[in-house]
């Protein structure tokens, strides 16, 4: 539907405003008390929005599963966050609750000019109006930029089966499999993006693979380029074919050359282990599967997390309380986990910390390998939050939470146990000290247990699994972390492919790639009036004051304040100061500005040259850190459309910096990019392991408190030596219930001696 179709006149706009104001006055309470202002839509709300949209006859909606692109259908419904100023007035000043609205994305494929249009629908829970949500000024959402739907995948699968009919004998001989009518020996595919070479195109390379556990690691050597830009699937065509290092104009040409003996054929081995009589063993020993192989001596169960007196955190709706912490959360279907209204010690330190985007940028020798630049919000990053397994994905003691997504469906879909919340020991003390008497004994020992609260979810974007953690420490430190695991994106082995990756199996190249993740960090440090400054070390060379004949070199502190956005946008390749501070004009008792420090843990680097073709969709990836002034028009660094139209995306982060606004004593947002280069290696078979493949950042109080706020923790032990040679241990935790899980009595002897 064209945006002009539902344009409102001044009278209509006035009526809409009155409806919204009236709705705000009588908006019902939502789960989680005031935190409900951030809560994801309930199943009832999602259904109400869907029903309201269907009641608008001018939209001419059809079910999303209808197998045609020439239809109007709802693609996404999710909660639309109210404006920050309205939320803060509601939370802090007792103003009325903001209107609760949904964001609805509709694909209008039945229009003469197919398009994608977004609407705000409200008020919830009983919608009565809808209004346009236009893209940023100067941008549009092209029809070709929409994410691929299940219906489109079904049509593409049919097209691939149809187009490869001339290759049935070729497939049987080279792979032992086929498309369609294949029983247990089938072919499947992986599609890559961007889909084409210029804006408006929808031309996708497909990797054909053998269907079996871990099929991502079983390419057949055949890749096809399909043009599927038309709303009529009958018009879709296979434009090119690549097989084992050579290009062909069509499947028919490859089939003909194969029949003529002109194709360099690779016969793929049977991946299943064989018995003595040539029959497949009952349990396949697939290299791409998780089945144990090899021998470890340990066959006992490992340690478990226990909570003898139950959890020390509480959960009310979408509000979490833990020690000094309080925060709300939501699992946004489009982009993932958001932490909101973060308080510590009763004081807000952040309004929002959220995942914005995750990309994986590849190189390769095959056309699919060299084309792959995954921008994962375009693949439903926030909606692929599948079930978490107790004792593996999260401790058995965790609280598991379900999620609802209305994404490419005709109603809300329940994802059980999509999130988990748990406390765990870190295995490292938060702090400790052994105070030696330097005579074989000690004056005291003191230590504070390392305990953290973790909120976790995952995103399984086809081959890759991202584990998303927000971690809360008892000393006011918060950490955001991403762990990468799952299957590597792999292509067919050719000798030339070794320039772009590692040979992982007989016919397999693991393609090198860079993972980058972007976060939005809206810190409110002692209020919304903040500035940005850095601290660095500089060496000085001075005359030694107590020995003037000598020189002294020592570190000094260099403080830099930044007044403009461009100054605070640090590009990859330029030095990034170690101490990155969001500061308040308020001071702590010792005269220092109350601040929070950003500390990045990352091995990221610039991957694409600035301005190079698809790079326009990920301009945030130019900067490990950029600090901007808060604007309601700059809430996300990416969009669900950037993947499929990276050449003219509707969201270009670089534009956030173009006006170069003042950032002194303003409401500030930090945009953080972390990541790492992944050169696959044989130990990535069957899956990439998490150790060494985790990145993130810390938010650390820096002169924010007068002393360590973890002094309030009771997980402390202080041990004193007594004159009789024994020790006295002071503890502040409650006595544990008698049970088989009771740990042994605490003991400590601080002496040391030669032996």
Curated annotation (Swiss-Prot):
The record places the active site at 376, 464
- Tell me the cofactor note: Binds 1 copper ion per subunit. Binds 2 calcium ions per subunit.
| UniProt-annotated binding residues for Cu(2+) | 513, 515, 678
Principal place of residence: secreted
Q: Which residues bind Ca(2+) 2?
A: 565, 656, 659, 661
The entry's localization annotation reads: Secreted, Extracellular space; Cell membrane
Q: What class of enzyme is it?
A: oxidoreductase
The Gene Ontology biological process annotation of the record reads: putrescine metabolic process
Residues that the record marks as modified (2',4',5'-topaquinone) are 464
**Cofactor list:** Cu(2+); Ca(2+); L-topaquinone
Pfam families recorded = Cu_amine_oxid, Cu_amine_oxidN2, Cu_amine_oxidN3
Role summary = Catalyzes the oxidative deamination of primary amines to the corresponding aldehydes with the concomitant production of hydrogen peroxide and ammonia. Its preferred substrates in vitro are the diamines histamine and 1-methylhistamine and it could therefore play a role in allergic and immune responses. Has a broad specificity for diamines and can also act on cadaverine and putrescine, two products of amino acid catabolism. It could also act on polyamines, like spermidine and spermine though less efficiently, and regulate various biological processes.
* Record text on subunit structure and interactions: Homodimer; disulfide-linked.
Record's protein name: Diamine oxidase [copper-containing]
> What's the source species for this entry?
Sus scrofa
Taxonomy-wise, where does this protein's organism fall, top ranks first?
Eukaryota, Metazoa, Chordata, Craniata, Vertebrata
């Amino acid at each position: 539907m064209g945006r002009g179709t539902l344009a409102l006149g001044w009278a209509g706009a006035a009526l809409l405003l009155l409806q919204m104001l009236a709705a705000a006055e009588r908006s019902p309470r939502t789960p989680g008390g005031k935190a409900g202002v951030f809560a994801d839509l309930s199943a009832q709300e999602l259904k109400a929005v869907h029903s309201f949209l269907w009641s608008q006859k001018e939209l001419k909606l059809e079910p999303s599963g209808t197998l045609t692109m020439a239809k109007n259908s709802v693609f996404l419904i999710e909660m639309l966050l109210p404006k920050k100023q309205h939320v803060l007035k509601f939370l802090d000043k007792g103003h009325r609750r903001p209107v609760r609205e949904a964001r609805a994305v509709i694909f209008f494929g039945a229009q003469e000019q197919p398009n994608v249009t977004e609407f705000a629908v409200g008020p919830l829970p009983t919608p009565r109006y809808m209004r346009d949500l236009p893209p940023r000024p100067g941008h549009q959402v092209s029809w070709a930029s929409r994410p691929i739907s299940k219906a489109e995948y079904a049509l593409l699968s049919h097209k691939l089966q149809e187009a490869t009919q001339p290759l049935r004998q070729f497939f049987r001989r080279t792979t032992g499999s086929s498309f369609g009518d294949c029983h247990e020996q089938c072919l499947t595919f992986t599609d890559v993006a961007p889909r084409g070479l210029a804006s408006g195109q929808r031309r996708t390379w497909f990797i054909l693979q053998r269907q079996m556990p871990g099929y991502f690691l079983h390419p057949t050597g055949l890749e096809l380029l399909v043009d599927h830009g038309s709303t009529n699937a009958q018009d879709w065509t296979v434009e090119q074919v690549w097989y084992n290092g050579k290009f062909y104009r069509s499947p028919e040409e490859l089939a003909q050359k194969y029949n003529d003996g002109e194709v360099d054929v690779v016969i793929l081995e049977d991946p299943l282990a064989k018995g003595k009589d040539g029959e497949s063993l009952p349990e396949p020993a697939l290299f791409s599967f998780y089945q144990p192989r090899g021998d470890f001596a340990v066959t006992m169960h490992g340690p478990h997390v226990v909570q003898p007196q139950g959890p020390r955190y509480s959960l009310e709706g979408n509000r979490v309380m833990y020690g000094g912490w309080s925060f709300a959360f939501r699992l946004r279907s489009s982009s993932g986990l958001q932490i909101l209204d973060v308080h510590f010690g009763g004081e807000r330190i952040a309004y929002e910390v959220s995942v914005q985007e995750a990309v994986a940028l590849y190189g390769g020798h095959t056309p699919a390998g060299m084309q792959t630049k995954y921008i994962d919000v375009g693949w439903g990053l926030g909606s692929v939050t599948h079930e978490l397994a107790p004792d593996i994905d999260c401790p058995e003691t965790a609280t598991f939470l379900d999620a609802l997504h209305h994404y490419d469906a005709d109603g809300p879909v329940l994802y059980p146990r999509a999130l988990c919340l748990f406390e765990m020991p870190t295995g490292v003390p938060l702090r400790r000290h052994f105070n030696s008497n330097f005579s074989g004994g000690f004056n005291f020992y003191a230590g504070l247990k390392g305990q953290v609260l973790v909120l976790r979810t995952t995103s399984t974007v086809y081959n890759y699994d991202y584990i998303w953690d927000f971690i809360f420490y008892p000393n006011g430190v918060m950490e955001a972390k991403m762990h990468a695991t799952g299957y590597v994106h792999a292509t067919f082995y050719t000798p030339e492919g070794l320039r772009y990756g590692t040979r992982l199996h007989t016919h397999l190249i693991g393609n090198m790639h860079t993972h980058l993740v972007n976060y939005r960090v809206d810190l409110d440090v002692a209020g919304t009036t903040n500035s940005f400054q850095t601290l660095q070390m500089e060496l000085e060379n001075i005359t030694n004051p107590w020995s003037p004949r000598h020189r002294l070199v020592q570190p000094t502190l260099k403080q830099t304040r930044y007044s403009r956005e461009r100054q605070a946008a640090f590009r990859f390749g330029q030095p990034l100061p170690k101490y990155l501070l969001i500061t308040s004009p308020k001071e702590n008792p010792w005269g220092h500005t109350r601040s929070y420090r950003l500390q990045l843990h990352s091995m990221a680097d610039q991957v694409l040259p600035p301005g190079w073709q698809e790079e326009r969709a990920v301009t945030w990836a130019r900067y490990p850190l950029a600090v901007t002034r808060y604007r309601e028009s700059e809430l996300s660094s990416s969009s669900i459309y950037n993947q499929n139209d990276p050449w003219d995306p509707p969201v270009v982060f670089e534009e956030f910096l173009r006006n170069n606004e003042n950032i002194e004593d303003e409401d500030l947002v930090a945009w953080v990019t972390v990541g790492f280069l992944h050169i696959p290696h044989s130990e990535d078979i069957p899956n990439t392991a998490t150790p060494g493949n985790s990145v993130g950042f810390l938010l650390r109080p820096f002169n924010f408190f007068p002393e360590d706020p973890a002094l309030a923790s009771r997980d402390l032990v202080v041990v004193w030596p007594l004159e009789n040679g024994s020790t006295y241990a002071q503890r502040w935790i409650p006595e544990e219930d008698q049970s088989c899980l009771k740990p042994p009595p605490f003991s400590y002897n601080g002496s040391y001696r030669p032996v």
